Amino acid sequence: MKKILGFLFVIVILGCGGYFVYVNYIKSKVPKLNLEEEVSNASKYYVYGNHFNIEGNIDIKDKNYDSLCLTLYNGEDKDIEITSDTDGGKINYYISNLINDGLYLDNLDIGTYYLVLKATYSNNEDSEKPIIKYYGIKNDTKYKKTVYYTLSKYNNIITIDSNNEYNTLEFVVKKNNSKNKNYDVTIDPGHGGMDGGGASGNYKETDFTMDISKKVKSNLEKAGITVKLTHDEGDIDKNHVMDEYNKGGRAVIPNEVKSKYTFSIHINKSGSSKVKGIEVYTPSDINYDLAKDIVNNITSNTSLGYSSNRLYKKFDGIYTHNFTESEVKSAIDGYDEKNYKHYNVTTKSNYLYMIRETGGFMTGAYVDSSNPDKVGVNPYYDSNIGNESYLLELGYISNSTDVNTLKEEQDTLAKAISDSIIKEINEKM
């Protein structure tokens, strides 16, 4: 009996080992790809949220192609639509001009893929067999190697590199065998510790932000989504505030834990008790579908309405605030007054640090090591991987109607937010 059990054990081990070898090595081998002499140059590439985007150009002799696209080649072509135009003989192209659109990475099968430019030409001799030409993509950026961690459901690591026989961008997808836990979503309960946030009457912001954040977290986890809170009750001493930067800072945690989305939960305040309603703040140059869904879900299922605020408004309840020219000047003047070294703040920088500093260069992050002792350092400020981040102002603490909603409809409010996030993630899966 022991011999039989031992034999079965060996068979199981060999089977598992064989599958591991197949998945990680044999399956990853890709048939030879023939590339043309001309090479495309990639001037920018990044991953924002869970979408890959690239910008590049190429000068090819024969521009009479019928179609032009990118393709991920692994023995078969996985075509990716692009937008292109010709400028001075060169062809410029990009996947999307929206930072949270592009190639969705998480559902790529395990294996090795080569990203190339693909031109299709008519075949005068055989109309049924068009002529296909492939062009390698030279990585002209400073990001020579990028490592992306997928959603926990897939639990893969994607390494984007250009050190291969084709000298083109290569995507290697493997199982994530790391013991370090990564997260899908980061939720940041606004303020905390001695910083109670906005206050009015008997209430302050932190009377609501932590409870709502934890309820959203619970709802997401029930749906199989892993969630990291930037801080929990008791994490911040009542005589201290949470660091924004450095290791474990609230604007650094999202990239430390490799999350794809960040939601910062706040309650607004106005000098007028008549101002009320929700304001969802976003990055610029995005697809606003998720923001719209959050706003519509909240206004349809709770007593919170759209804010009457018109400043930085993009749509009902949705706002995008990048630094204006005057705000850039004011920031620089402020650095001089405090004797700080200047940061590279521009009109491409989002004004809200939880959106800006979690999004890498795509959202204009700038907190480098210029003032480490006074401000801290965001080690991911210049990263080409960033969280898709939103700041939710869930009504006004200075308005009695909104406060009553925050007290009486908190579960419904949390569900409205979490339902939108679940929908966003599941639709992409």
Located regions from the model:
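Short hydrophobic alpha-helical membrane-anchoring segments
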Residues: G15-N24, E424, K428
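Basic, ligand-binding patches in group-transfer machinery
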Residues: G18-K175
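Short glycine-rich His-centered loop
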Residues: N182-N202
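Cell-wall polysaccharide-cleaving catalytic domain and substrate-binding groove, primarily
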Residues: D195-E205, E388, N399-T401
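Active-site-proximal helix/loop segments of hydrolytic enzymes
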Residues: M210-M429
